Regions:
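Mature catalytic core of soluble alpha/beta enzymes
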Residues: 1-322
Length: 322
């Protein structure tokens, strides 16, 4: 029996499609899934003043802040990806997000706040945030503001998959916004088919389809949330290296990984790295990524791993829908 569950979280909705026995009571499973995403939101939301993230952001420099083990796990992976990407993925962009009007503080850019945030955002998180995993504490060595929006939703999807595994469910697709993870195949053995959204602002259309089996996928782009400044489209994703929003011709970037947390963070990193540095980074780190670039009024594909047109065919493919 195909079971479809969903609920609210993080300003959007989570969903799970799973194949279960006909006599399965969905209520305990749905409650456990909701509790899992609610816990991530309570710990890591920049929109909730009482979250553990905001408690860390309010803490004075050099003070040691006790944090939940789950959040420290996400922070540790965020810092590792920040290091591997040379700061392209940087969770220390919270002040920039707020200054440009994409956070909880304001809904439009503020020139003075942008200048101040730029002065305090030059040191990436992997150089200015220390974690003591054994003691369960974090310590800021600079006045940075952490934002985990580029990794927390992916982690929430992984948490949903962990719940499904706890309930001995072997065939499922968990989703939260543009982050999805397949647990096994469908019950009939077919992979899960996931539509890739075309990055055209103002409309919902399908660019292609990805087939997933025991894999996660995440997409980042400039087409959902952006501001127009001087006629230029500036995405809500921040480039901490420039202390400014991402500004390149990447319309969207889709990444496959074993965990949704990694897919989410690497999609952000490759969006920031852009078409000049992103492909080399993807090849160096063995990432599987599909870029959609805006070139002379059309979308151009560029890929790595199984998305590389020169690569041999793999179970995960992209194609135009019929």
């Amino acid at each position: 029996m195909r079971l479809n569950l969903n609920g609210p979280t993080m300003g959007t909705r989570w969903s799970v499609n799973c194949d279960v026995a006909p006599d399965r009571d969905p209520k305990p499973l749905r409650a456990a899934l909701q509790a899992a995403v609610d816990l991530v939101d309570a710990q890591m939301s920049p929109w909730k003043p009482g979250s553990d993230l905001m408690r860390l952001n309010r803490a004075p420099v050099d003070s040691r802040v006790e944090l939940p083990a789950e959040m420290l796990y996400v922070l540790d992976r965020a810092l590792e990806i920040s290091r591997l990407s040379a700061g392209a993925f940087d969770p220390a962009v919270g002040a920039l997000v707020d200054a440009w009007g994409f956070g909880a503080v304001r809904d439009e850019p503020d020139a003075q706040a942008i200048r101040v945030a730029g002065d305090t955002s030059r040191c990436p998180a992997h150089q200015s945030l220390e974690l003591d995993l054994d003691a369960g504490r974090a310590c800021k060595r600079a006045g940075l503001q952490i934002d985990l929006c580029g990794i927390a939703k992916g982690h929430a999807v992984d948490c949903m998959v962990a719940v499904l595994q706890h309930y001995d469910i072997r065939h499922a697709l968990a989703a939260l916004d543009g982050e999805l993870r397949a647990l096994g195949s469908q019950a009939d053995g077919q992979p899960w088919a996931v539509a890739l959204e075309s990055p055209e602002p103002g409309r919902r259309a399908v660019h292609g389809v990805i087939e997933l089996q025991d894999l996660a996928v995440a997409t980042s782009g400039d087409y959902r949330r952006f501001v127009l400044v001087g006629g230029a489209r500036l995405a809500h994703t921040m480039d901490g290296r420039r202390a400014a929003p991402v500004r390149n011709d990447v319309a969207s970037i889709t990444v496959l990984a074993r965990t949704c947390m990694d897919a989410d963070a690497w999609a952000t990193a490759l969006l920031v790295a852009g078409p000049s540095d992103g492909p080399a980074m993807a090849h160096r780190l063995g990432l599987e990524a599909l870029w959609l670039l805006r070139r002379e009024g059309t979308l151009v594909e560029m890929g790595s791993g199984r998305f590389d047109s020169a690569a041999a065919p793999e179970p995960v493919t992209t194609h135009s829908p019929s």
